[in-house]
Amino acid sequence: MARLVGVDLPRDKRMEVALTYIYGIGRTRANEILEATGIERDLRTRDLTDDQLTHLRDYIEANLKVEGDLRREVQADIRRKMEIGCYQGLRHRRGLPVRGQRTKTNARTRKGPKRTIAGKKKAR
């Protein structure tokens, strides 16, 4: 099993898909990486040579922020917004949607399960 930046890549998947198992790399970025390193997209992870694996590892470490570094940066950005008190920071602090979605209905993922209000009756 190939290991890149602390992630075990699945052996039987094509490289284009296998790279997306790394946090911070999607399909587009995976294709850019493979093109830059000269590795075929259709090549399976199990068929990679040690040389190709080393080349991939060096390219990713030199040019991209992935996994732990990226997660830390995102968390730091959220924390900074909360500290300066901007609108997005307030939404994060209150656990509400940040990017303008409606909250009268829906938004259950961010708000959590419904809380029933005692004494409130449905209108007929």
Swiss-Prot record:
The keyword Disulfide bond does not apply. Keywords: Ribonucleoprotein, Ribosomal protein, RNA-binding, rRNA-binding, tRNA-binding. It comes from the Bacteria. Signal peptide: none annotated. Belongs to the universal ribosomal protein uS13 family. Part of the 30S ribosomal subunit. Forms a loose heterodimer with protein S19. Forms two bridges to the 50S subunit in the 70S ribosome. This is Small ribosomal subunit protein uS13.
